[in-house]
Design a protein with these regions (language model features):
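Structural motif
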Residues: 2, 73-74, 116
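Short glycine-/acidic-enriched loop or helix-start segments at secondary-structure transitions
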Residues: 15, 85-87, 128-130
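Short His-Asn-centered micro-motif
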Residues: 6-8, 76-78, 120, 162-163
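Glycine-rich phosphate-binding P-loop
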Residues: 3-21
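Short loop/turn segments at strand-loop or loop-helix junctions that form parts
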Residues: 32, 77-81, 85-86, 119-124
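Glycine-rich phosphate-binding loop used to anchor ATP phosphates in small-molecule kinases
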Residues: 53-112
Length: 164
């Protein structure tokens, strides 16, 4: 069974991930965002020039789907929903409708691979790691977008809502 964590970036999901992994004997798939940014020579995705940022975001989605296809007993500390919500929050005005539809189409294969989606709305503030945007107000906006994405992708019945 695949367990997917979907949470705003300011929320520390590590305890939930560890509990799920231990209780169900699952391996942990960590968010590849930092590695992908560093591979392009950047600390965060937000520093990248626009087109490179879009390419990196697509690469995150592709990498995530490939990892899911290789492992079925896993808990992921990330989801396509979080990346899509972040894209909507920060790049909406720079993404034409046709391009956004292509991004959604790229993301769609992840959804049937998801088992339980653990939506963590709020909780303990994540420690600064030099990568994530930890502003709570931004997190509230991302969290609202996550809920819309579950509906758009037709997977509300697999979402479990909780707090850390």
């Amino acid at each position: 069974m695949r367990h997917i964590i979907s949470a705003p970036p300011h929320v520390d999901v590590s305890a939930t991930v560890a509990e799920l992994a231990k209780a169900q004997g699952l391996s942990v798939q960590s968010d590849p965002s930092r590695k992908i940014c560093e591979a392009y020579g950047y600390q965060t995705i937000y520093e990248m020039p626009l087109e490179l940022q879009k390419r990196a975001r697509r690469q995150l989605i592709e990498t995530h789907i490939e990892a899911l296809q290789q492992r079925d007993q896993v808990v992921c500390d990330h989801s396509v929903f979080t990346w899509l919500a972040d894209w909507m929050r920060w790049l909406w005005s720079e993404t034409p409708a046709e391009e956004w539809e292509a991004v959604l189409d790229l993301s769609r294969p992840a959804i049937p691979l998801y088992g339980t989606i653990h939506h963590i709305a709020d909780g303990k503030l994540a420690a600064y790691d030099g990568y994530r945007w930890l502003d709570r107000r931004n997190g509230v906006q991302i969290e609202r977008l996550l809920r819309h994405l579950y509906t758009d992708f037709g997977c509300n019945e697999r979402v479990v809502f909780s707090h850390t």
